[in-house]
């Protein structure tokens, strides 16, 4: 990565498509070190880590990074239902302000009902219980 001159790395560190390979802890730390050198960013597309068969949740680049240089993306279409086409993005604080200033005019295209369903799943604890049930079931089949 050092010799490329790139300033942005887009990665799916957990079960990366199409290989299915998960980045090792040392590789994840290498990504973080690369981003810290200079004005660089990592876009972490974390669309499947919730379904790790490990008993310990996978560490995200966002959680390892002090949240300064990592933009975290995830979706509910893998964890709740493929028909629920809802994703989300978590930005570093300084980018959140810039995003709001430059792109704040965009309106959310997700229907209100779907937003309320997701909010209820999260707030009630049902989402986390669902993830834990699926992970336990997956561990039994492995």
What are these regions (language model features)?
Residues 71-142:
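PLP-dependent aminotransferase class I/II
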Residues 2-5, 16, 21-41, 48-79, ...:
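Active-site pre-lysine segment of PLP-dependent enzymes
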Residues 7-12, 43, 88-90:
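Structural motif
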């Amino acid at each position: 990565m050092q010799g490329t001159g790139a300033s942005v790395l887009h990665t799916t560190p957990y079960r990366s498509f199409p290989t299915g390979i998960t980045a090792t802890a040392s590789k994840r730390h290498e990504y973080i070190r690369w981003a810290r050198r200079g004005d660089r960013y990592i876009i972490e597309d974390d669309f499947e880590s919730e379904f790790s068969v490990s008993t310990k949740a996978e560490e995200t680049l966002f959680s390892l990074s002090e949240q300064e240089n990592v933009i975290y993306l995830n979706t509910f279409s893998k964890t709740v239902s493929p028909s629920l086409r809802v994703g989300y993005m978590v930005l570093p604080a300084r980018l959140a302000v810039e995003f709001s200033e430059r792109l704040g005019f965009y309106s959310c295209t997700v229907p209100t009902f779907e937003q309320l369903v997701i909010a209820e799943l999260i707030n009630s604890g049902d989402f986390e219980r669902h993830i834990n049930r699926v992970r336990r079931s997956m561990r039994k089949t492995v």
